[in-house]
């Protein structure tokens, strides 16, 4: 793997290609990456993908997995959190707990307007249907994340997305390009059982709200407890959408999304 075409790839060259050309160029590399363990994938990415390496985390139910995995290979990697101001109190305490336990290099980014200012100007966007939710996400998650990637001069962005989590993630590759940076998903093929065994093996905890019936945790106003008959996707954003926008390509300036 270390001697494959992967080690010769340059981000600037890939950005000059069309989306289809990018996918084809990365196809062989992704096939090889699928054969590696998650830790081997992370180490490969650190060695072969250029630019500052960062990892994003919402500090959700299974957040400890990705944070532990990546910091094993690079202890000081910047950990990006987009803080909306509407996270659960348990989430803020979980952030403090993991930051201390794993000695995280936490980098917190927030919207340019405070939550109170936004409500005064727009009302409660999360109650305004799909358009309101998308505007809310753009203001509080997408823009702060783009700013984080720019300010940290990120070239490679690690994320803990998994195919099992939703239909929108079912066909994601390990390596892609999103909005001008490498996007790397080392646990994309892991199951919930894989995650559980990893956390157990390394003495790591789930988010505390898991014990109260939450499968996924985001903001207080767009997260529901799981009830019989619900899918995980239906516990977020009133079931109107699964993605908050962070993991979607804007499709304007750059080619391949995920």
From Swiss-Prot:
Q: Which Pfam families match?
A: PAPS_reduct
The processes (GO biological process) annotated in the record are: hydrogen sulfide biosynthetic process; sulfate assimilation, phosphoadenylyl sulfate reduction by phosphoadenylyl-sulfate reductase (thioredoxin)
The reactions it catalyses are: [thioredoxin]-disulfide + sulfite + adenosine 3',5'-bisphosphate + 2 H(+) = [thioredoxin]-dithiol + 3'-phosphoadenylyl sulfate
| Keywords annotated in UniProt | Cytoplasm, Oxidoreductase
Q: Could you name the active-site residues?
A: 244
Q: Which InterPro entries match?
A: PAPS/APS_Rdtase, PAPS_reduct_dom, PAPS_reductase_CysH, Rossmann-like_a/b/a_fold
According to the UniProt entry, what is the EC number of this protein? 1.8.4.8
Asked if the Swiss-Prot or TrEMBL record annotates the protein with the keyword Oxidoreductase, the reply is yes
| Primary residence | cytoplasm
**Pathways per UniProt:** Sulfur metabolism; hydrogen sulfide biosynthesis; sulfite from sulfate: step 3/3
Q: Does the keyword Oxidoreductase apply?
A: yes
**This protein's GO CC annotations:** cytoplasm
GO MF entry, a single one: phosphoadenylyl-sulfate reductase (thioredoxin) activity
Top EC class for this record = oxidoreductase
Please state where this protein is localized. Answer: Cytoplasm
State its role.
Catalyzes the formation of sulfite from phosphoadenosine 5'-phosphosulfate (PAPS) using thioredoxin as an electron donor.
The record's similarity note reads: Belongs to the PAPS reductase family. CysH subfamily.
Q: What is this protein called?
A: Phosphoadenosine 5'-phosphosulfate reductase
- Species of origin: Vibrio atlanticus (strain LGP32)
Highest lineage ranks of the organism? Bacteria, Pseudomonadati, Pseudomonadota, Gammaproteobacteria, Vibrionales
């Amino acid at each position: 793997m270390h001697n494959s075409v992967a080690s010769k790839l340059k981000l600037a060259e890939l950005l000059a290609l069309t989306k289809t050309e990018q996918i084809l160029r990365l196809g062989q590399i992704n096939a090889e990456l699928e054969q590696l363990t998650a830790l081997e994938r992370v180490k490969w990415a650190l060695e072969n993908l250029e630019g500052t390496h960062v990892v994003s985390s919402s500090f959700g139910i299974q957040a400890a997995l990705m944070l532990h995995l990546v910091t094993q290979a690079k202890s000081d990697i910047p950990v990006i959190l987009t803080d909306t101001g509407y996270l659960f109190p348990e989430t803020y305490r979980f952030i403090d707990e993991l930051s201390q336990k794993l000695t995280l290099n936490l980098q917190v980014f927030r919207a340019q307007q405070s939550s109170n200012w936004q409500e005064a100007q727009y009302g409660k966007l999360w109650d305004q249907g799909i358009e309101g939710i998308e505007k809310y996400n753009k203001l509080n998650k997408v823009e702060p994340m783009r700013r984080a990637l720019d300010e940290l001069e990120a070239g490679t962005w690690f994320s803990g997305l998994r195919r099992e989590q939703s239909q929108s993630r079912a066909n994601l590759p390990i390596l892609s390009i999103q909005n001008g940076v490498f996007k790397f998903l080392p646990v994309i093929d892991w199951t919930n059982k894989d995650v559980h065994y990893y956390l157990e093996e390394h003495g790591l905890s789930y988010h505390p709200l898991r014990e109260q019936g939450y499968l996924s945790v985001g903001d207080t106003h767009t997260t529901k407890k799981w009830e019989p008959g619900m899918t995980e996707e239906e516990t977020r954003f009133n079931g109107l959408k699964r993605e908050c926008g962070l993991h979607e390509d804007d499709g304007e300036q750059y080619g391949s999304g995920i």
